[in-house]
């Protein structure tokens, strides 16, 4: 497989390794992101469609739906989620997360 190829729909990420290509499906990146959300105090992934992923080469763009514990400051929790998810996805996949949109779907007690 010479070169690095990717699907036009952006659902897979291919990276060149010395021994061959590593293919990371967008669904896997989404699961990594969803788990990382749950590691942030006061946040959890929304039950419905927790993550949308767009991949372009080595660049990952995420849109996350999260629930935030009431009465925590929503912007502070969202900022912590953004920082932690970026770090976790980049560390595990080796890809660069350029942008994370966060939608607050619910405040929970």
Question: Where on the chain are the PLM-derived regions?
Answer:
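Generic hydrophobic secondary-structure packing signal
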Residues: 29-33, 62, 74
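Short, hydrophobic beta-strand segments
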Residues: 13-20, 60-68
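Peripheral (non-transmembrane) domains and long loops of multi-pass membrane proteins
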Residues: 26-27, 61, 101
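Terminal low-complexity, intrinsically disordered regions
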Residues: 1-44, 109
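Residues at secondary-structure transition points
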Residues: 23-28, 69-76, 80
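Short edge beta-strands and adjacent turn/loop segments
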Residues: 40-67, 105-109
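Short, non-transmembrane amphipathic alpha-helical segments
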Residues: 74-93, 97
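A short amphipathic beta-strand at an alpha->beta junction
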Residues: 91-109
